[in-house]
């Protein structure tokens, strides 16, 4: 044991000497310099400056060190882009050199890092196949048109649940209700089943499923010592790998069981094919065009379930928080709904184009509460030059979307909820306007934007069109706090619970 400790200390000392020499050499020049950044402490670099909310800490540092700054996180060099111009540089202009995804140590489990579309490089054949399938078979306009009835039914059930709460005078946990809606949508689209029930968050499958998804998104977003100091990775000092082994493993097992049941059913002579994504992929896996394995399908589905359930639900909850904080905006939205949607109980996807204030409201929610405030970090595949600065190979690259959307030089009154700012603007969240890129941009942008957009507009619109909302007595200030919890998805710290009142 003593020999191991001495060897580790010797290695750490040698690494520190080399790191300081290498860092000094880069800053002196030699073909270019690093972007400016805050002073670094020995060994830990700037880790102490991240805090519990890295997106906010990095935004504060960017005010001093500029829209492209460098930091040292343990022995990892990192660069943070905090302006639309720098975001365009790292995501588009240098997108090839800087597009390798960062794979956290904690998710190198169950083979997930080897086949997850979120972790694979854009040069990977698996990545290309799965992105093509997602784009053509799941998120294209024809594919979404074919699954519109599934989404309409989920919205109807959400409305029915809110109406039940209204009849009983019972508060509805908005985040849980929207999570149930989105997770049931994912499972209905993928497997033709519903996994969870409204109002049953403390029982059975509901509690376990949401616990798994929340644990995955939270723990994947936590800064991990094992990523900053790979020498400590086998020790898993924060226990993140252990936690994710359990939670990710449970979701993989759930999906594998559903796939196995379908494979067994398809062997039956009287099997009637289902019009879901699983049957589509199983058919494709038997052909030569896509060369899909069951393992790839399983991990792809887990990626879809996590991303589709949690981020959209969190964004819808934030939307309701802002509207309840600003009753004048809510009334303006309700008036538009009454004029366009009329007596219908559900906002249809075909209505969205005729609801400019609803579209502006969703844009403003994405601006104030981007689901992934730092996007998914990338790694430099090769050395790249951004303006006069050099980004060395293997540098971790972040885009601080949260800093961009709170920048007073871009947005007037950036901390205020003002949907009106988008009524006379062509800016949207689909990846072309770098002032607002909650889903990223370029080759690694989220392919699920069309689905997320449809559901967010319809969920927020339907809840506002059918109900007035009251907060529980004595809980008003707590319920409407804007405090968030950092992770892959930016969650509200105190869940919003409000009583729907049928209009």
UniProtKB/Swiss-Prot annotation:
One of its GO terms (biological process) is terpenoid biosynthetic process. Keywords: Heme, Iron, Membrane, Metal-binding, Monooxygenase, Oxidoreductase, Transmembrane, Transmembrane helix. SUPFAM superfamilies: Cytochrome P450. One of its GO terms (cellular component) is membrane. InterPro entries: Cyt_P450, Cyt_P450_CS, Cyt_P450_E_grp-I, Cyt_P450_sf. Its main location: membrane. It is a single-pass membrane protein. It catalyses: 11-hydroxysugiol + reduced [NADPH--hemoprotein reductase] + O2 = 11,20-dihydroxysugiol + oxidized [NADPH--hemoprotein reductase] + H2O + H(+); 11-hydroxyferruginol + reduced [NADPH--hemoprotein reductase] + O2 = 11,20-dihydroxyferruginol + oxidized [NADPH--hemoprotein reductase] + H2O + H(+). Monooxygenase that oxidizes 11-hydroxysugiol to produce 11,20-dihydroxysugiol. Can oxidize 11-hydroxyferruginol to produce 11,20-dihydroxyferruginol. These products are intermediates in tanshinone biosynthesis. This is 11-hydroxysugiol 20-monooxygenase.
